[in-house]
Amino acid sequence: MAALSSSSLFFSSKTTSPISNLLIPPSLHRFSLPSSSSSFSSLSSSSSSSSSLLTFSLRTSRRLSPQKFTVKASSVGEKKNVLIVNTNSGGHAVIGFYFAKELLSAGHAVTILTVGDESSEKMKKPPFNRFSEIVSGGGKTVWGNPANVANVVGGETFDVVLDNNGKDLDTVRPVVDWAKSSGVKQFLFISSAGIYKSTEQPPHVEGDAVKADAGHVVVEKYLAETFGNWASFRPQYMIGSGNNKDCEEWFFDRIVRDRAVPIPGSGLQLTNISHVRDLSSMLTSAVANPEAASGNIFNCVSDRAVTLDGMAKLCAAAAGKTVEIVHYDPKAIGVDAKKAFLFRNMHFYAEPRAAKDLLGWESKTNLPEDLKERFEEYVKIGRDKKEIKFELDDKILEALKTPVAA
């Protein structure tokens, strides 16, 4: 297969194309894309489309609408005591870290409750090994089991709770029930944009059909039935210092070693990659505007799409190098695309219309510039010199008769 596709829906496939052409402008709010056998099938659900819609009402519908991540302390608005229940693994952990720092900068009080034990090996990794930044900013850090949240926080009362941990009702219910009984005024929940059903009309927007049996959906329904003031946030992929789940690093690993970058399918699949500061600023906007946020679901993403090929090119530009992209059919080669590639092999793109309409929120993600910062840190920590094995890549490249490295 050719290194770069010869045709593109929105931009030239040539590596010399302006970087600005690699990003899809938010003005393209509604468009139809040619589907392929792999475009949306992985999000199909056995439940009917009618049963997939949540029974509670949403105010939103399909309508138009630098590395340092601090904000100036503001004297406007009520200062609140916020509890963040934070996961101890995965890409979402960094959301709680950024959110805590932004809240502290805005003058709020913050306690971050991390699942598990402070002495565990997980706490030696980012963002947990940077929690001193939260403490130095005036925040508190505690560890424990969210099912026993009252005991962990020692009876302290809070105005706002964010659950950035649970993926199912069994995990989240104890926190919701405790929050309600203890007088918490606002409950925020980190859900996932992965709960949307496949669509022939991307992007996903708030109000689109979801998979009714998905754990996050069940939690959202319980919140709607139980809590007076609640809001749910559905993120996608993210980048940012302190993230412990690979995103841009996957591309950098190959680019700095002059290896071809294998991307399944055409490489034109759209996705959304946000800087985590966008996610934290959206959450902070909800804390500042609780009535506007109440009872709503927000796609917690930036406002521009990028293609999979485009992400590879942007990462190469950030590293000051060229990139060879090779496309492949996972089934024909006999590899599992989920293991060989870090993103979904399909259009997976949501837009943050509700946050713009209801909260007056604006995205600050700028992938070309953000990726330059990320590459600087990548080199600073020495990952560009780390020994890395590429067994699946080698299998793919061998099948395509492509040299492993230039």
UniProtKB/Swiss-Prot annotation:
GO terms for molecular function: mRNA binding; poly(U) RNA binding; rRNA binding. It comes from Arabidopsis thaliana (Mouse-ear cress). PANTHER family: CHLOROPLAST STEM-LOOP BINDING PROTEIN OF 41 KDA A, CHLOROPLASTIC, UDP-GLUCOSE 4-EPIMERASE. One of its GO terms (cellular component) is cytosol. Residues 1-72 form a transit peptide. Binds and cleaves RNA, particularly in stem-loops. Associates with pre-ribosomal particles in chloroplasts, and participates in chloroplast ribosomal RNA metabolism, probably during the final steps of 23S rRNA maturation. May enhance transcription by the plastid-encoded polymerase and translation in plastid via the stabilization of ribosome assembly intermediates. Required for chloroplast integrity. Involved in the regulation of the circadian system. This is Chloroplast stem-loop binding protein of 41 kDa a, chloroplastic. Component of a complex made of CSP41A, CSP41B, ribosomes, and the plastid-encoded RNA polymerase. Interacts with CSP41B. It is found in: Plastid, Chloroplast, Plastoglobule. InterPro entries: Epimerase_deHydtase, NAD(P)-bd_dom_sf. The modification Phosphoserine is found at S266. Disruption phenotype: Lethal when associated with CSP41B disruption.
